[in-house]
Amino acid sequence: MGRGKIEIKRIENSSNRQVTYSKRRNGIIKKAKEITVLCDAKVSLIIFGNSGKMHEYCSPSTTLPDMLDGYQKTSGRRLWDAKHENLSNEIDRIKKENDNMQVKLRHLKGEDINSLNHKELMVLEEGLTNGLSSISAKQSEILRMVRKNDQILEEEHKQLQYALHQKEMAAMGGNMRMIEEVYHQRDRDYEYQQMPFALRVQPMQPNLHERM
């Protein structure tokens, strides 16, 4: 008696379903590895369980992006939507602009100009001339600013020197007055010592004669 056809349907028991998923998943990945080795095939496999956890396998000789690109080219089906397509086009446009800027920069340096025609060389020369004029104008502006700052610093230096000189003169004037006062005091002391004793006492005791 032959075996009856087994109906394939969802396993209701969650535990049994998880066990069956793990076994079948491991079996599929094992078969993918075997066909890669035995047949030199390129295999890419992605599995998502009902929990959202991902398992994947890709042949060592390729990558998942390469497999997807190959699928898109072979099948003629577009895997990316318009948004991704626009983003890819924008990236390509920016790359081209960057390449063009690099070429122009080399031309400005005088490199790789043998391929330029007369008109292109004229445009390049005009651009360099305008650039030199702008640089010269900027240099002149910076030079004027430097000279102006030098004048300001020189004026401030003169003012500081004048203030310092005035302060030194005031200090010297005070010292001279102190020196003159010391000399005058010494002269008075000397004259006082040269006077007779009686005369020295008389100014200090004006009523002495009256008592005598």
Curated annotation (Swiss-Prot):
One CC-aspect GO term: nucleus
Domain K-box: 84-170
Keyword DNA-binding annotated: yes
UniProt xrefs under InterPro entries: MADS-box/MEF2_TF (IPR050142), MEF2-like_N (IPR033896), TF_Kbox (IPR002487), TF_MADSbox (IPR002100), TF_MADSbox_sf (IPR036879)
Single GO molecular function: RNA polymerase II transcription regulatory region sequence-specific DNA binding
Localisation: Nucleus
Pfam families, per the entry: K-box (PF01486), SRF-TF (PF00319)
SUPFAM superfamilies assigned to the protein according to its UniProt record, in alphabetical order: SRF-like (SSF55455)
GO BP: positive regulation of transcription by RNA polymerase II
Tissues with expression: Predominantly expressed in petals and stamens, less in carpels and sepals.
Transmembrane feature ranges: none
Main localization, broad class: nucleus
Keywords annotated in UniProt: Activator, Developmental protein, DNA-binding, Nucleus, Transcription, Transcription regulation
MADS-box domain location: 3-58
Protein's job: Transcription factor involved in the genetic control of flower development.
Designated name of the protein: Floral homeotic protein PMADS 2
Species whose genome carries this gene: Petunia hybrida
Gene (name only): PMADS2
